[in-house]
């Protein structure tokens, strides 16, 4: 790792892990992109294109018709002065103009990585772990300065980027577009990957070739959303899971985002990422500044799996924080699919008794414990215990659960309010709304206005009081609708389009305060399942409920796609009842267990109604998972067979010292007279022998290069899980 500046060539060379990222000051201070890829000693211009006089590409210097910003590979481009591609930023002046011209002013290089004020971001524990470059660009005419921040990590092929706008002039500026990064590739000979989905089928992998024009993944929902995820990748045509070049872009933010690739007339590709400029503006008074969120860029020459492993380790160790970052996560039982709203203290205690018998460690009480919450039509915001259901309160219930040797956890949804609630009747102006318009509801609820400091203060104190009222060690933080009528009664008209981003800043403040007050509590984020599974949430809460769809077969694609970016320690995965409540499928308890044991393991069904056979199998599942939990949650993850490409799925976990591994294989549908097949493993020590429980002892090289035969079985939804241990030689 190093960041170097060569004053003779005016080149910046960032070395991150085994990758190089090179920029150069060009002409009169324009910042050009030169190279990003496998580490090189130096870049002397072997790949530099000749400068040509291109028709309809204007020239900022009329005396040189071979220079146009329209053809320059850039780092943070503007619009309006000869570049017709999508800009990284756009600023409106008081005279209505949106033309700006940023040129190099200065730079500084220093050890470590600064935190972003009020925003989640990756971090370092020691300044030797990374080096940061700040390049200051300025528009002297209007007094605008933009500081581009690049951090290169020593351990990983990781460059993080963000931008800070400062108004050092005398007039008010309005940001219309303020993306976190942009980078131009000299060729568009790539595929691109994004993770589209919907409620119940989040983060499916979609790969397609780049084409001329704009292709994008974005959210305008006020959240990162089920429908898209703040991640894209450029993938070399020949790249697959284990070989080839991949460029990953992941946005550390939980609100509206834009991840865009534009292929221009000359076959170059511009990748841009940041806050979605749709319905966004931000006023910058003289002396004020605006900080964009962070983008984490990963280069891999080891295919998609190489990219994923970098994201996994970085996000697990340098994005997630707190006591649970490195701690094994408990096996839980959640009552939601067992009872929905229809429960009382006796039902929950009975579930806890059975859970203790099975070896489960944590009982989570889901929605319905507060106010008059007998359905989803009332009481959100009234965070007072329903004594009819829980006559001894949360404290009394939690103590009964604790006496059984179990921890107690709780569901909350602090960002929402029901119109039929005491909170709404008292403060109808506390929700997002615009004057004289009806307030649209989703799941019979409205969104609290977290852009307001008084609302955030109220939520911090109210939820803190709840969490302090009982021995609670786990919280599931839910959010069950997206934003409409986005406006705030606390902001003036000219700042209304700041509301969505101010909401996110308020949410991050609330989460930071509450998680800091209760460091002993494991927080799991949720948004109708995986509707806000993003890096921003992981900064405050180290795990996320992956999807409300608990069907084992559906989860193969959901968890496989999620693993493209997010570590296994972040994925909540539960065994639920059959027929499954979301899709009606009936899969065996064995298969449901194997899928759920591929994440943070738990159960979500009425365990008081189990047969003795089911109880015995669950006891075995719980005991087995406890034995492999650290390997699953913190081991190196390899994807082996994609459920998006066929009828099978497989993945494996390998310990850091390669002495132990766990392999999971799944086949969805049976086939008559099916061919025999084998599975090639990954990540083992080629010089080491491994014992596969029940199969024998084999060399790591044989298992990786020749593979292991898959048993022949004739039924739908089958699964196998093999544990490998190195044989002492």
From Swiss-Prot:
Q: Which UniProt keywords apply?
A: Carbohydrate metabolism, Glycosidase, Hydrolase
Gene responsible for this protein: agaA
Ways its activity is controlled: Not inhibited by D-galactose or sucrose. Inhibited by pharmaceutical drug 1-deoxygalactonojirimycin.
Q: What is the pH-activity profile?
A: Optimum pH is 6.5.
A GO molecular function for this record?
A: alpha-galactosidase activity
Q: What does this protein do?
A: Hydrolyzes the short-chain alpha-galactosaccharides raffinose and stachyose.
Q: Which GO terms describe its biological process?
A: protein homotetramerization; raffinose catabolic process; stachyose metabolic process
Amino-acid positions noted as binding substrate in the UniProt annotation, renumbered to this chain? 53, 199, 366-367, 443, 476-480, 526, 548
Q: Which reaction does it catalyse?
A: Hydrolysis of terminal, non-reducing alpha-D-galactose residues in alpha-D-galactosides, including galactose oligosaccharides, galactomannans and galactolipids
Q: What is the effect of changing residue 336 to N?
A: Very strongly reduced hydrolytic efficiency against raffinose, but displays low level of transglycosylation activity compared to none with wild-type enzyme
Q: What is this protein called?
A: Alpha-galactosidase AgaA
User: Temperature-related activity notes?
Assistant: Optimum temperature is 65 degrees Celsius.
Where does the record place the catalytic residues? Answer: 478, 548
InterPro entries referenced in this protein's UniProt entry, alphabetically:
Aldolase_TIM (IPR013785), Alpga-gal_N_sf (IPR038417), Alpha-glycosidase_related (IPR050985), Glyco_hydro_27/36_CS (IPR000111), Glyco_hydro_36 (IPR002252), Glyco_hydro_36_C (IPR031705), Glyco_hydro_36_N (IPR031704), Glyco_hydro_b (IPR013780)
Report the source organism.
Geobacillus stearothermophilus (Bacillus stearothermophilus)
Q: Summarize subunit and interaction data from the UniProt record for this chain.
A: Homotetramer.
Record annotation: effect of changing residue 478 to A: Loss of activity
Q: Which family does it belong to?
A: Belongs to the glycosyl hydrolase 36 family.
């Amino acid at each position: 790792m190093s960041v170097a500046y060569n004053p003779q060539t005016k080149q910046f060379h960032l070395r991150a892990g085994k990758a190089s990222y090179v920029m150069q000051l060009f002409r009169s201070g324009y910042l050009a992109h030169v190279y990003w890829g496998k580490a090189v000693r130096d870049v002397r211009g072997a790949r530099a294109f000749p400068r040509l006089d291109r028709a309809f590409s204007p020239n900022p210097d009329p005396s040189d018709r071979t220079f146009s910003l329209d053809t320059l590979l850039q780092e943070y481009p503007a619009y309006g002065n000869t570049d017709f591609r999508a800009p990284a930023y756009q600023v409106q002046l008081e005279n209505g103009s949106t033309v700006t011209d940023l040129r190099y002013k200065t730079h500084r290089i220093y050890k470590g990585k600064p935190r972003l004020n009020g925003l989640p971001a990756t971090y370092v524990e020691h300044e030797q772990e990374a080096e940061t470059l700040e390049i200051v660009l300025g528009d002297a005419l209007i007094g605008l300065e933009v500081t581009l921040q690049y951090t290169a990590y020593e351990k990983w092929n990781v460059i993080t980027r963000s931008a800070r706008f400062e108004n050092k002039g005398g007039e008010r500026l309005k940001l219309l577009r303020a993306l976190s990064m942009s980078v131009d590739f000299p060729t568009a000979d790539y595929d691109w990957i994004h993770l589209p989905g919907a409620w119940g089928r989040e983060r499916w992998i979609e790969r397609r070739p780049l084409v001329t024009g704009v292709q994008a993944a974005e959210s305008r929902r006020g959240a990162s959303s089920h429908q898209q995820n703040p991640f894209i990748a450029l993938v070399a045509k020949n790249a697959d899971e284990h070989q080839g070049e991949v460029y990953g872009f992941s946005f550390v933010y939980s609100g509206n985002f834009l991840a865009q690739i534009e292929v221009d007339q000359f076959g170059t590709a511009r990748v841009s990422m940041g806050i979605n400029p749709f319905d966004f503006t931000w006023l910058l008074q003289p002396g004020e500044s605006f900080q964009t969120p962070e983008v984490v860029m990963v280069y891999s020459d080891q295919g998609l799996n190489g990219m994923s492993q970098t994201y996994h380790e970085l996000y697990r160790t340098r994005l997630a924080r707190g006591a649970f970052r490195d701690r094994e996560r408990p096996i839980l039982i959640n009552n939601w699919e067992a009872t929905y709203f229809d429960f009382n203290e006796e039902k929950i205690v009975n579930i806890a008794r059975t859970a203790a018998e099975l070896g489960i460690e944590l009982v989570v009480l889901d929605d319905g414990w507060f106010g008059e919450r007998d359905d989803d039509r009332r009481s959100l915001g009234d965070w007072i215990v329903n004594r009819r259901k829980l006559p001894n309160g949360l404290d009394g219930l939690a103590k009964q659960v604790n006496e059984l040797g179990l921890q107690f956890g709780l569901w909350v949804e602090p960002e929402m309010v029901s119109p039929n609630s005491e909170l709404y009747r008292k403060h109808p102006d506390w929700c997002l709304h615009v004057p004289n318009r009806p307030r649209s509801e989703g799941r019979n609820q409205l969104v609290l206005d977290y852009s307001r400091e008084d609302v955030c203060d109220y939520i911090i104190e109210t939820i803190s009081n709840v969490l302090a009222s009982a021995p609670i060690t786990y919280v599931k933080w839910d959010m069950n609708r997206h934003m409409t009528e986005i406006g705030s009664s606390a902001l003036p008209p000219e700042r209304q389009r700041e509301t969505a981003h101010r909401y996110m800043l308020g949410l991050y403040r609330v989460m930071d305060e509450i998680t800091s007050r209760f460091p002993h509590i494991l927080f799991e984020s949720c948004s109708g399942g995986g509707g806000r599974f993003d890096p921003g949430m992981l900064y405050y809460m180290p795990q996320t409920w992956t999807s409300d769809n608990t069907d084992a077969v559906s989860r193969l694609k959901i968890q496989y796609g999620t693993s493209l970016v997010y570590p296994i320690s972040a994925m909540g995965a539960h065994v639920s009842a059959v027929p499954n409540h979301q899709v009606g499928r009936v899969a065996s308890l064995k298969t449901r267990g194997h899928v759920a044991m591929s994440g943070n393991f738990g159960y979500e069904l009425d365990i008081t109604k189990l047969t003795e056979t089911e109880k015995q199998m669950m006891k075995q599942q719980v005991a087995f998972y406890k034995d492999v939990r650290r390997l699953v949650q913190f081991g190196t993850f390899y994807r082996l067979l994609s459920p998006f490409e066929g009828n099978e799925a497989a993945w494996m976990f390998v310990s850091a010292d390669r002495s132990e591994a766990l392999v999971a294989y799944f086949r969805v549908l049976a086939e008559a007279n099916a061919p025999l097949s084998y599975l090639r493993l990954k990540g083992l020590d080629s010089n080491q022998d491994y014992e596969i429980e029940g199969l024998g002892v084999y060399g790591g090289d044989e298992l990786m290069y020749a593979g292991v035969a898959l048993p022949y079985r004739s039924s739908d939804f089958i699964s196998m899980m093999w544990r490998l241990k190195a044989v002492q030689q």
